[in-house]
Amino acid sequence: MSSAHNAYNAGIMQKTGKAFADEFFAEENQVVHESNAVVLVLMKSDEIDAIIEDIVLKGGKAKNPSIVVEDKAGFWWIKADGAIEIDAAEAGELLGKPFSVYDLLINVSSTVGRAYTLGTKFTITSELMGLDRALTDI
């Protein structure tokens, strides 16, 4: 059997019948853990590499010091508490060519959190937009 925590037939998935039910419904497994963490996974490209280096790691980290960027072969894995925001207009200036929020969205592989676009900005947030904070137009 595999000992990996995220593999098939590992952990609780190794169990069947009563053993599975006992662990699945155990008191310690009935707790919801609150998290403000958000994740953005971007496919690598020349444009995205520049955006990661100059916008996310510099300006983004200045706004949100919890941002962590990991190189995952063909992808950039970005995690932060609260929110990750990328302004496509700023990216266009950096790249020296037109770059819309839709050009950015083509490279979005995965997200954890609530994703939305507003104007030229793409945001992943842990907030309930419209409930925790008003979503305003620009």
From Swiss-Prot:
Coiled-coil annotated spans: none
Cystine pairings recorded for this chain: none
Keyword Protein biosynthesis attributed: no
GO MF, one example: monooxygenase activity
The keyword Metal-binding is assigned to this record: no
Keywords: Monooxygenase, Oxidoreductase
Signal peptide, first to last residue: none
Known role: The B protein acts as a regulator of electron flow through the soluble mmo complex, switching the enzyme from an oxidase to a hydroxylase in the presence of the substrate.
Protein family: Belongs to the TmoD/XamoD family.
Oligomeric and partner information: The soluble methane monooxygenase (sMMO) consists of four components A/MMOH (composed of alpha/MmoX, beta/MmoY and gamma/MmoZ), B/MMOB (MmoB), C/MMOR (MmoC) and D/MMOD (MmoD).
Protein name: Methane monooxygenase regulatory protein B
Organism: Methylosinus trichosporium
